[in-house]
Each structure stands twice: as C-alpha cells, then as structure tokens.
C-alpha cells in the first residue's frame, strides 16, 4: 500500500487524539447493537440483551479498548500492516472462527464514532485517509481466510 504524506499524518493525528477509553467501548457497543448477530462471538460477556446493557458492560468496554490498542500497532507499522496482523488474523480465523465480514462492520462503526468525535474536522479528505487505513486493516485481518 502506498501512503501519501497527508494520509500518514492524518492517521497519526487521529489516533493521537482519540480517547481510547471512550471511543473503543462506543465502537464495539455500536457494532453489537447495530449488528446483533456479532454478539455470538461474545457469549461470555454476559448482558448483551439491549443497548443499555451493552453500553454498561465492562467486558465490552475492556475489549473495545483492546481493539483500539490493536489498531495502534497498525498505525506504528503502516508500511507492513499485513505482517503486523498475521498472528491476529490466524487467531480470529482458526481459533475464534470470526466471520471476516465482521471486521468491516466494526471498521464502519469506528468510522462513525470517530466522525462524531471530530465533527467538522472529519472532512471528506480525512475520511478518505481513515477509510483507506481501515480497509488495509480489515484486509490484513482477513488474510488468513483466503
């Protein structure tokens, strides 16, 4: 993947400003509410029966934060995201049996949450860079499925 200077700077800027303990839980909670079939991967998380239960679930919050810290690895290794996520791809495909389409759903939810946090600063150009980055992440996580 070729990254422009603007794209690199934009991705680094976004992730330097994201409050992981807010955005991570909000992103995963949104995914579990909007796409309820994704809940099947989180059976041990307890109350996922409604939006309030999901939003208040400590395990959802913790895993949402973990996801964002996982994205940090991609930000720090933008030139080698596929290899950076090789083990994580194996884990999700072979052990957890996660449908790879769910990575795209989660990426879309993250884009919405980030856009709401950044407001007018999330311009079309910023969104294009962010979505390109997330598309590379999603592709890398799905690498083991092919």
From Swiss-Prot:
A single GO cellular-component term from the record reads: haptoglobin-hemoglobin complex
PROSITE patterns annotated for this entry?
A: GLOBIN (PS01033)
GO aspect biological process, one term: hydrogen peroxide catabolic process
Q: Which residues form the Globin domain?
A: 2-146
Q: Out of the domains of life, which is the source?
A: Eukaryota
Write down the CDD domains for this protein, in alphabetical order: Hb-beta-like
Protein keywords:
Heme, Iron, Metal-binding, Oxygen transport, Transport
Write out the tissue specificity statement of the associated record: Red blood cells.
Q: Which residues form the signal peptide?
A: none
Binding annotation for heme b: 63, 92
Alphabetized GO MF terms: haptoglobin binding; heme binding; metal ion binding; organic acid binding; oxygen binding; oxygen carrier activity; peroxidase activity
Gene3D superfamilies xrefs: Globins (1.10.490.10)
Q: What does this protein do?
A: Involved in oxygen transport from gills to the various peripheral tissues.
Self-association state and partner proteins as the record states: Hb2 is a heterotetramer of two alpha chains and two beta-2 chains.
Name the family: Belongs to the globin family.
Miscellaneous remark of the record: This fish has 2 hemoglobins: Hb1 (major) and the minor Hb2 which constitutes about 5% of the total.
| Protein name (record) | Hemoglobin subunit beta-2
The gene behind this protein is hbb2
């Amino acid at each position: 993947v070729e990254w422009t200077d603007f794209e690199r700077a934009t991705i680094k800027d976004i992730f330097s400003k994201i409050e992981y303990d807010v955005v991570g839980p909000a992103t995963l909670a949104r995914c579990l509410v909007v796409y309820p079939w994704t809940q099947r991967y989180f059976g041990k998380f307890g109350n996922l029966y409604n939006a309030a239960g999901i939003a208040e679930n400590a395990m959802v919050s913790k895993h949402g934060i973990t996801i964002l810290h996982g994205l940090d690895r991609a930000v720090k290794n933008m030139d080698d995201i596929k290899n950076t996520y090789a083990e994580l791809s194996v884990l999700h495909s072979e052990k957890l049996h996660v449908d790879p389409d769910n990575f795209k759903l989660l990426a879309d939810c993250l884009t919405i949450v980030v856009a709401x946090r950044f407001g007018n600063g999330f311009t079309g150009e910023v969104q294009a860079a962010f979505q390109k980055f997330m598309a590379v992440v999603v592709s890398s996580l799905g690498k083991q499925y092919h």
